[in-house]
Amino acid sequence: MADDKGTDPKEGCSEWFIDNEADCSDLENDLEQLFDESPKSNISNLLNDEEDVEQGNSRDLLRQQEFEESAEQVQKLKRKYFSPKAVQQLSPRLQSMSISPRQKSKRRLFEEDSGLELSGLEQSLTNEIEDTPAELEVPAATPAEQGGQGEGNLHYKELMRCNNSRAKLLSKVKEYFGVGFYELARQYKSDKTCCKDWVIAAYGVREELVESAKQLLLNHCSYVWININGIMTLYLLCFNHAKSRETVGRLLMSILDVQLLQLICEPPKLRSVVSALYWYKGSMDSSVYAHGAYPDWIVNQTMISHQAAADAMQFDLSEMIQWAYDSDLTDEADIAYLYAKMANSDSNARAWLAHNNQARYLRECAQMVRHYRRGEMRDMSMSEWIHHRIQQVEGEGHWSEIVKFIRFQEINFIIFLDAFKQFIHGKPKKSCLLIHGPPDCGKSMFAMSLLKVLKGKVISFVNAKSQFWLSPLSECKIGLLDDATDPCWQYIDTYLRNGLDGNVVSVDCKHKTPMQIRFPPLLITSNYNIKANDKYKFLYSRIAIFEFKHKFPFKEDGTPVFQLTDQSWKSFFERLWTQLELSDPEDEADNGGTQRSFQCTTRDVNGHL
């Protein structure tokens, strides 16, 4: 049995079993060598127990698979959390800006790692994040927000990349139209300022939207001027109503499907002949779409007949003075503002705006109106002045409101009326009226209402250190010194006794020699009763004194019980005209209507109004 090799052929298999292809053998004759080395058939010799056998390919395969899986995970982390430094070194500022989401650089995607970087992955990620600048990523805008697709979208993105998009647009206008934008338009600082005419430069508008806008803008504008040149479009729009830059921008954004970044909106130069000629000549070009009648500022500067009339037009200061006198304006700011608003309808106002000496003419106009008004006032008696003033009061009131208020203060109305009659006539030692009493009893309200209807002047003791503080009394028919205190009474007792007597006094006025005048009727209100102090005894005969004892009453809704208005004083003077011994207006020919109004211009009396 030991000499026989193999197995018994009687049991199923009588031949040697030979496998033609070995599964895990690298040698061709492994089987022969196995049998040749062991002449004995001992099955235990098939295994070598003398030394350890090394692990086969399974461990190496597992290690390779784990290595590849780890490398893939590391590469995914690198692509997710940081970008390559090489791109940042080229332009760190460009790398920190991104208009739309973009893919990270993949240059390290297939690099093999040595193993050292894998072992220090956490430290490397920390260093890379600290060294990588923050990126500013702007989400990609939708096509509707970009104001067009394709080429228009690219133009919009080009503007977004510019540091100064406005300078970019201005350069494009100069490049495509051959003229600077601000040679045709003037600049408004505020977006709220309104104007009827606007010059608009639009960048990157789709051509089909420009064509549709020609019809849509006709609903809003009286004149439309459109010139398309490449990616730029120039508009001159004369709207039916004045609009602000914000309103114009929103309108064009909805019609042209653009962003505000793509528009420049400014009002045109209305007094530039060169600018007017550009719009006029451009409307004759076949590439320009123009619809509607020319605006007036273009016609006046381009048409021959209008130009000749404009050249012949000269500014007449007397017309401006007459207008200010008729409007009863003496303040320079009011005259300047209101007269400038008339430039659209008045040729003289338009000529004044075009003049280089506007300020000088304005100052002279206001000064002349004050001279005329002062001369007119001095020429009138007190009766004429009162009648002149109440004729300018509109509406009707009731004189009993004033009578009720005087009786409410426990004052005999007959005594008050007699003192008031002598007061307005300016009789010597009777031309000063004092109303004193506790606070909130209506002293100032009563005095101010009378001063307003008679257009008097107020003097304030706060200016007493100036020698000019009495000068307003030379320009009025009635004066008021409100809330006189003890220092004020000391000043009056020391320096103004002769003025209260009705004598001529010298009053110093600024930029003039001292004037010789008589004080007009002077009304004084005070919380101080001079009769309570004997040191003012010399003023007793010069001042008529009345006391208001009760606080002024108000209704539950806060309105005053007694209506001391211009209409009430108008009714008071008309009702008590005879009792106040005022002269009849008919005797002075003041209300007959045949007397011609004051005229300070050289125009023909029978000329057109």
From Swiss-Prot:
Major localization listed first in the record, in broad terms: host cell
Annotated positions of the Phosphoserine modification: S83, S91
A biological process term (GO) from this entry: DNA replication
Signal peptide: none
Keyword Nucleotide-binding: yes
Cellular compartments per GO CC: host cell nucleus
Keyword set includes ATP-binding: yes
Post-translational modification: Phosphorylated.
Keyword tags: ATP-binding, DNA replication, DNA-binding, Early protein, Helicase, Host nucleus, Hydrolase, Isomerase, Nucleotide-binding, Phosphoprotein
Superkingdom: Viruses
InterPro entries: Helicase_SF3_DNA-vir (IPR014015), P-loop_NTPase (IPR027417), PPV_DNA_helicase_E1_C (IPR001177), PPV_DNA_helicase_E1_N (IPR014000), PPV_E1_DBD (IPR046832), PPV_E1_DBD_sf (IPR046935), Rep_E1_papillomaV (IPR016393), Znf_lg_T-Ag_D1_dom_sf (IPR037102)
Motif (Nuclear localization signal) on chain: 78-80
Region (DNA-binding region): 148-312
Known EC number: 5.6.2.4
Chain sites annotated for binding ATP: G437, P438, P439, D440, C441, G442, K443, S444
Residues of the SF3 helicase domain: 411-561
Region (Disordered): 37-67
Reactions listed under catalytic activity: Couples ATP hydrolysis with the unwinding of duplex DNA by translocating in the 3'-5' direction; ATP + H2O = ADP + phosphate + H(+)
GO molecular function: ATP binding; ATP hydrolysis activity; DNA binding; DNA helicase activity
Subunit field text: Can form hexamers. Interacts with E2 protein; this interaction increases E1 DNA binding specificity. Interacts with host DNA polymerase subunit POLA2. Interacts with host single stranded DNA-binding protein RPA1. Interacts with host TOP1; this interaction stimulates the enzymatic activity of TOP1.
HAMAP family the UniProt entry points to: PPV_E1
Family the entry assigns: Belongs to the papillomaviridae E1 protein family.
Function: ATP-dependent DNA 3'-5' helicase required for initiation of viral DNA replication. It forms a complex with the viral E2 protein. The E1-E2 complex binds to the replication origin which contains binding sites for both proteins. During the initial step, a dimer of E1 interacts with a dimer of protein E2 leading to a complex that binds the viral origin of replication with high specificity. Then, a second dimer of E1 displaces the E2 dimer in an ATP-dependent manner to form the E1 tetramer.
Name this polypeptide is given: Replication protein E1
Source species of the chain: Human papillomavirus type 49
Lineage: Viruses, Monodnaviria, Shotokuvirae, Cossaviricota, Papovaviricetes
Encoding gene, per UniProt annotation: E1
